[in-house]
């Protein structure tokens, strides 16, 4: 009787409700210095993009976001973009490998960002034939930086052709 009836009598259900307010930008800056793990990925992103894109703070925040959210495709794509700006195509490729599912994401912005970043990494590695379809896909989705990367790809092809001609002349 104790195990069958009394546990039923002592059953209590709790329901707790609370509102979690967002930090203001100024509060986020302060919290980011001391306890960035208390901030959401979006709050950290807003802080990162408030710095110049060539600054150490900008890149540092994207590195930190990746440390805190290592399995998030957006964190990996953004970290890859930061690494590409610093010329580290190999590290960017590793981030993009973690976000590989994003290329088929229903979110067109995420898929085009992935395609552009992967194409840019391949471009930096002089793998032009592999880079082109990815950059075209991103450009067709409306990504302006992909169009600029395609222009760079064509310049690089021209440079490679000139270099090959010079090599043939000197032989």
Each predicted region: which residue ranges?
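N-terminal targeting segments with Sec-dependent signals, encompassing both cleavable signal peptides
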Residues: 1-171
């Amino acid at each position: 009787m104790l195990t069958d009836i009394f546990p039923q009598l002592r059953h209590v259900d709790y329901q707790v409700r609370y509102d979690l307010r967002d930090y203001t930008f100024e509060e986020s800056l302060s919290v980011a210095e001391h306890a960035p793990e208390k901030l959401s990925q979006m709050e950290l992103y807003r802080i990162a993009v408030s710095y110049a894109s060539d600054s150490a703070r900008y890149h540092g925040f994207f590195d930190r976001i990746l440390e805190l959210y290592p399995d998030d495709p957006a964190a990996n794509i953004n970290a890859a973009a930061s690494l590409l700006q610093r010329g580290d195509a190999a590290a960017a490729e590793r981030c993009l490998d973690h976000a590989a599912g994003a290329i088929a994401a229903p979110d067109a912005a995420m898929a085009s960002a992935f395609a552009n970043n992967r194409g840019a990494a391949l471009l930096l590695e002089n793998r032009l034939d592999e880079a082109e379809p990815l950059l075209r896909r991103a450009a067709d989705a409306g990504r302006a930086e992909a169009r600029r990367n395609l222009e760079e790809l064509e310049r690089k092809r021209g440079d490679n052709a000139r270099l090959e001609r010079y090599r043939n002349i000197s032989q």
